[in-house]
Regions:
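Proline-centered linker/hinge motifs at extracellular inter-domain junctions
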Residues: 148-150, 201
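Surface-exposed, flexible coil segments in extracellular/virion-facing regions
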Residues: 185-203
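N-terminal pro-sequences and low-complexity stem/linker regions of secreted or lumenal proteins
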Residues: 235-809
């Protein structure tokens, strides 16, 4: 590449002085007439260290005058010459050419002059010196200053993983300056440079991609600098396994027994569910061990409890409610009146749009759901949800799923512990808490309903379970609802109320929870709030949980920092999707708490969150995007736009092979499977659409793991063991299916898992450290006994899911 630079000095001539002489003789005593010619005299100033080989000149002028000749060159700092015999005239031009001995520079300059009288003229010639190919040109106006030349830049190695360093080395020369006189300035489009004013800096990669490292070398003249660059590649760290891409798909509000309570695994596999435990029979009717899931009503107590002092088993289960499920088809929301209206939904295949037009209850809101067989006289345990008048594609009522409520519903006490159930959680207060904590309809007995996969319910997820690997010991990390559990999926921890700079402060008192019962009621909460300082055992609701944790043999750390209030129930982030900070309403203050997004970004590993409805704004779930709470990913538009995407963007990335290493994806509100507002079959359709998109890109599919799971159990009953890990959970089991070429075979895994297991898998697969010193991903993998693979003997312990894979397939 040719570079043109301007220097302040002149190679040729300082001054070319011309004088008119009265004739050619130097003898002043001779009286003759002038011959009407003159002569031109000049001194050639040569810059230090520059050795000229030749200096040629050409003079052209009036009446066709032309003369070309050479000047004798002496190896000195001044070369003098006189050019005689130039006729009087106006408008002469002299052109000088000089070349250095090493032939590295050829200089050319010209000037005009007149010989029209006896006075002396001075003429300056500005010469342009062209260095040999690729070095540039020089405009000279005095003593020569040749620009430095960058001869080359080497980068070793030319490609490294993010976090590693590349050695850069440049060579530069300047024919009229010593090497020590040159200054170096390096710049980079990404990463950090050590030694950026030396010839040999080191680049440390911080982000994946092509990085340009640029060098400017100067000899001190602001107008004279040489520039050159080199491109290097900072690559993402290679995964430890054949899994190069992970997609985490998160639906809403279904427990394992609610979804797979009747599932029968392939031969050679076992599963823990309602059917295998004899709680129900194969036809869904009460089984011989139905009492294991019997529900009870607690007696009144003065304060909040997580295990009542006394309780009475229901004779008849409180009936299921239609709650807020849609009563009829609607033109602007599911279930739509026709397929044209349903076509506004772009995140499922056209063949599945009909699901958005069916399933209205045909009943008023918040009444007994008589579509359930024998709804008003159900026995006091699990019941089959679907039947002759309740098809699988029907919308059903929601249930309560909040923090203090779920602690009560699971009824945990060390006094109830057994070797198979050392936590002592009986899970026998689900309908009672739904009925008692509030006067509103919160699902009543809907929490005990289950689908029947053996009668055609949940067909696509059953197919995935039959084909790939499923866990029957996966749990929601947080007792309660959507927002806090999505936070666990990213932070591996609860989110604190802070001043925005990481310092804990108290939220407004009106937001604090007080689950103590109101006077004269049986468990009607005083304030169903969203925040608690769980380091304060005297705070409402806190003491009962801390006392239980302290009584457990393994004494789990509550993980409650001093004077810190934690997010327990759904509250929107301070940031809107476009990065604007909310100024009104209730929201979680911006946080700088670290998440898996920080861990990935620190190592240059690509990741995105794909939220259904993110682009169009309708149906998008803010509390389902844990990264939207973080200042580091929301305040800067470029960073936000890099990571926050829509489902349609995921479809494009899959098709183009540009899927990041780690993807979190949550469907819009119509497709997330949430009771009342969605249907489980719609979440199946969403997952099926994504897997079909992957099928169309076999190369990408071959290295991709799709994790199909849920945020929480939604307040539905589950019979599985619950491990108390800290103040915040765990909670009930939820489905987890791993879809990849390395999880085939319909195997059922029993290792104890929760949402943080997904973080642990990502960290192990890419060699990442735990997110923080207090996050749950610090806990070890479970150690179990052969006779009870569900209960870790080293509690608290959470699997990293690696034992669900066979990388030899």
């Amino acid at each position: 590449m040719n570079k043109t630079v301007i220097l302040k000095t002149l190679l040729l001539g300082g001054l070319l002085t011309s004088s008119w002489l009265g004739g050619c003789s130097n003898d002043s005593s001779e009286s003759t007439q002038p011959d009407n010619t003159g002569q031109l005299a000049f001194d050639l100033q040569v810059a230090p260290g520059l050795v000229l080989n030749t200096v040629n000149y050409t003079i052209v002028g009036p009446a066709g005058f032309s003369r070309t000749s050479a000047i004798d060159v002496t190896h000195s700092s001044t070369i003098s010459a006189i050019i005689s015999g130039i006729p009087f005239g106006i408008g002469y031009q002299i052109t000088l050419r000089a070349m250095t001995v090493d032939s590295r520079a050829t200089c050319l300059g010209s000037a005009t002059f007149d010989i029209d009288g006896p006075d002396t003229r001075s003429v300056a010639v500005h010469a342009t010196c062209e260095l040999q190919p690729g070095t540039g040109s020089i405009i000279v106006n005095g003593t020569l200053n040749v620009c430095p030349r960058i001869d080359g830049i080497d980068a070793t190695p030319a490609e490294v993983a993010v976090g590693s360093a590349i050695a850069i080395a440049a060579t530069a020369t300047d024919i009229d300056h010593a090497p020590s006189a040159l200054t170096y300035h390096w710049a980079t489009t990404s990463g950090t440079l050590a030694g950026d004013t030396t010839p040999s800096p080191a680049l440390t990669c911080t982000h994946a991609g092509l990085v340009t490292v640029a060098l400017a070398v100067s000899d001190g003249d602001p107008a004279c600098a040489s520039a050159r660059s080199v491109d290097v590649v900072c690559s993402e760290p290679a995964p430890q396994t054949a899994i190069k891409h992970v997609i985490v798909l998160v639906g809403e509000n279904r427990t394992f027994d609610h979804t797979f309570g009747t599932y029968v695994p392939r031969a050679g596999q076992t599963v823990s569910n309602l059917l295998s435990k004899g709680i129900i029979n194969a036809d869904g009717s009460p089984g011989p061990n139905f009492a294991l899931a019997a529900q009870a009503e607690a007696a009144p107590q003065a304060g909040y409890y997580i295990s009542p002092a006394s309780k009475t088993r229901y004779a008849v289960l409180p009936g299921p409610s239609t709650s807020g499920a849609p009563t009829a088809q609607r033109p602007t929301a599911p279930p739509f009146q026709n397929l044209d209206q349903a076509a506004a939904e772009t995140d499922i295949a056209p063949a599945d749009l009909a699901l958005l037009t069916t399933g209205a209850t045909g009943l008023p809101a918040r009444v007994l759901d008589t579509r359930v067989t024998n709804a008003g006289a159900l026995p006091d345990g699990p019941f089959r949800l679907t039947g002759a008048t309740m098809p699988y594609d029907a919308y059903t009522g929601d249930t309560i799923h909040r923090f203090y409520q779920m602690w009560q519903q699971t009824n945990c006490s060390v006094a109830q512990a057994t070797p198979d159930n050392p936590s002592g959680c009986l899970s026998d207060l689900f309908p009672f808490v739904a009925v008692s904590f509030s006067t509103a309809d919160n699902g009543v007995g809907s929490s005990m309903g289950f689908f029947d996969v053996n009668r055609g319910d949940v067909p696509f997820f059953k197919l995935l379970a039959d084909t790939y690997a499923m866990s029957d010991n996966m749990h929601q990390s947080f007792q309660g609802g959507t927002g806090a559990n999505h936070s666990m999926l990213a932070f591996g921890d609860a989110v604190a109320w802070t001043d925005g700079h990481g310092n804990p402060v108290a939220p407004p008192a009106s937001l604090l929870a007080n689950p103590n019962p109101r006077a004269g009621t049986n468990n009607r909460y005083t304030v169903d709030g969203n925040w608690s300082n769980c380091s304060d055992a005297t705070a409402p609701g806190v003491g009962a949980i801390l006392n239980y944790l302290g009584a457990l043999p393994h004494r789990p750390n509550p993980n409650c920092a001093p004077n810190t209030y934690y997010y327990l129930n759904n509250t929107n982030p301070a940031y809107d999707p476009n990065g604007t900070l909310k100024t009104t309403g209730t929201f979680v203050p911006p946080t700088i708490q670290r998440s898996i997004g920080d861990s990935l970004s620190d190592k240059g590993i690509s990741w995105k969150f794909y939220g259904g409805g993110f682009n169009r704004g309708t149906g998008y779930c803010q509390i389902c995007n844990p990264f939207e709470y973080q200042t580091q990913f929301m305040a800067d538009a470029a960073i936000r736009n890099e990571h926050m995407k829509d489902t349609v963007d995921m479809f494009t990335d899959i098709a183009n092979g540009t899927l990041p290493s780690v993807s979190y994806a949550h469907p819009d509100g119509a497709l997330d499977g949430h009771p009342s507002s969605s249907k489980l079959g719609l979440y199946e359709a969403y997952v099926k659409t994504i897997l079909t998109k992957l099928d169309a890109n076999p190369a990408l599919k071959a290295s991709t793991l799709v994790i199909v799971t849920f945020d929480e159990g939604g307040g539905y009953y589950d019979s599985g063991f619950i491990q108390p890990i800290d103040f915040f959970g765990d909670g009930t089991r939820i489905p987890l299916i791993l879809v990849s070429p390395y999880t085939r075979g319909g195997k059922i895994n029993h290792g104890y898992a929760d949402h943080v297991s997904i973080l642990k898998f990502i960290e192990r697969n890419w060699g990442l450290a735990p997110i923080t010193s207090r996050s749950r991903d610090n806990y070890p993998n479970p150690i179990v006994t052969a006779d009870n693979p569900y209960v870790p003997t080293n509690m608290p312990a959470i699997t990293d899911l690696f034992d669900m894979f066979d990388f030899n397939q």
